[in-house]
Amino acid sequence: MIDSLHGEVLHVGLNYVVIECSGVGYRATASPSLLGTLRKGEDARILVTMNVRDDGIDLYAFESDEARQMFAMLRKVSGVGPTSAMAICSIFKPDEFARIITDEDDAELRNVKGIGKRTAERIIVDLKSKVAVFDSGDSASEPQSGVGGNSEAEVDSGVVGTVTQALVELGFPEKQAEKTATSAAAEGGSVSEILKRALRSMSSERN
């Protein structure tokens, strides 16, 4: 069982990273917020979990052990595959996820592409008694970076690119994804917050 990877970052892709460990390059699917912290040529240590399939083994990387635990919980829910589980982990931090489940907010879960009402309700039912371990007890939202927002000209292009890539990976058209990511980033916040804001905007446009 591979628990973590430590080595040089060889490549940071759309939704994955390649890290060289003892001469072997390991590719792991990762969230936009984690990918945003990794730089090619730098040394990094990431936590991973393995998903064994009939035709191979996939690695998924996480920023924290709590996020990895959350992924494992989601994978135990019927109908939630690794792609959907990773999409949820990419958008919600563990404490945010705990509040969503506790509040039975299936609408928030349905903002994640591929999660319908029935699956969202099943996630809530199956995990409601298990997510207390993630609840920090702080009901306040995360501090916003760039309070008061920024003009679109001042928006960090790297953040916009990361969020755009995440939206494209989730199945949204690139042009629409970039426009929405730029607008969402103008309000400030972390990559995770901006991604959630963009998803809400794109979901409302579809309705």
Swiss-Prot record:
Residues 64-142 are annotated as: Domain II. The keyword Kinase does not apply. Residues 1-63 are annotated as: Domain I. Its main location: cytoplasm. One of its GO terms (cellular component) is cytoplasm. Residues 143-154 are annotated as: Flexible linker. Keywords: Cytoplasm, DNA damage, DNA recombination, DNA repair, DNA-binding. GO terms for molecular function: ATP binding; four-way junction DNA binding; four-way junction helicase activity. The keyword Lipid biosynthesis does not apply. The RuvA-RuvB-RuvC complex processes Holliday junction (HJ) DNA during genetic recombination and DNA repair, while the RuvA-RuvB complex plays an important role in the rescue of blocked DNA replication forks via replication fork reversal (RFR). RuvA specifically binds to HJ cruciform DNA, conferring on it an open structure. The RuvB hexamer acts as an ATP-dependent pump, pulling dsDNA into and through the RuvAB complex. HJ branch migration allows RuvC to scan DNA until it finds its consensus sequence, where it cleaves and resolves the cruciform DNA. NCBIfam families: ruvA. This is Holliday junction branch migration complex subunit RuvA. It comes from Corynebacterium kroppenstedtii (strain DSM 44385 / JCM 11950 / CIP 105744 / CCUG 35717).
